[in-house]
Amino acid sequence: MRVDIEKMEVTVTVIVMLLSFAGGSNIGNISARSKNRGKGSMWWGIAKAGEPNNLSPLSPGVPYLDSSAYYGTLRRKQRRLARENPGLLDAIAKGAKMAIHECQFQFRNQRWNCSTRNFLRGKNLFGKIVDRGCRETAFIYAITSAAVTHAIARACSEGTIDTCNCDTHYKGRPQVFANGNNAAAVTNVRDFEWGGCSDNIGFGFDVSREFVDTGERGKSLREKINLHNNEAGRWHVQSQMRQECKCHGMSGSCTVKTCWMRLPPFRVIGDLLKDRFDGASHITTSNGGNGRNNNKGHSNRLPKHPKMNAIMSNSIHSKRENRRRLHKYNFQLKPFNPEHKPPGTKDLVYYEMSPGFCEKNPKLGIQGTHGRLCNDTSMGVEGCDIMCCGRGYRTQEIVVVERCNCTFHWCCEVKCDICRTRKTIHTCV
């Protein structure tokens, strides 16, 4: 009897060992995917697809952009959206580049300057700082989501996406005056007609949700934060739709006024998100898990003008997918300080403190502030005292060579002088 038991134990041990050898790699991959979920987005790499170091050699000395370079940064659902909406991927790539440019502009005078790397692996585009749930990561998610929304909405009105065009649902609606009153209560205000070509914010908002939020299930705390910050970026774009008008009439008169809705330059969105970054909401880590609460701070509403273009892909409109999509946004984040109100729809949220940016940290992709330019007369974040972290700074005089006194000569040439000026600069030691 004891021999049989020993044989059974040996058999079980061998089976377990075989299973571990056969499926160990898969188990490891699953755990790795679970660990890395919500930390960085591969699609960010689209912004670098056209960089020289990401081009393939067509022939010696003649590089070209392989079409697979774009698709290599995308998930299956994102590739499907790109196939079903020709022209969409170019708009998203433009949005990703806009996001990087705006992020670097907003933080140009701060210790963290939103530096990026020049390769296609999007998760590492901004460095490993996105592994932290800090304020800088919140801004990255919000600005990239906002830029994609802005770029898609504008691309629709420009006619560069085959499956969408101008937003025409304003036509036939009651006229809205700048002061919000009814026409009967307004004097000396000219009527207008809806016309022109409005930016399609409904399409941009919804497709941005489908594309940008792919892979974010909203189950863990980090995924909820990513979804919230992505939504915050989109709502900042949607809320900035503006009415533009053009007058028609003899001798500059405004006999007829035609109006349409248009998005502002993306700099306006960047400024708003930078303000939200400065006042970002610190949330508690007890927000994790699958609990769903009545959501008052985090809106499930679609855009103010949610009617989508009739020719948009049916896959985006499927009722089942719509219900599942809205369900993952149904949560309320709790503030770290119970006395503070919960974060609103447009607030940026974080749960980890930012790392130090004074010294170089290759692990997080932080460049440090050594060698950075600073302003010796400023008391702000760009001042040498703060930028250089108390290490001091060097002052040197350089000669700047630039074109000046440019004049236009008919036709068609611009001639400039070469000017040399001395300039004093300050760099952190």
Task: Identify the role of each PLM range.
Residues 2, 9, 20-386, 390-429:
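Long, position-biased, composition-driven segments near the start of the mature protein
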Residues 7-15:
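Sec-dependent signal peptide recognition
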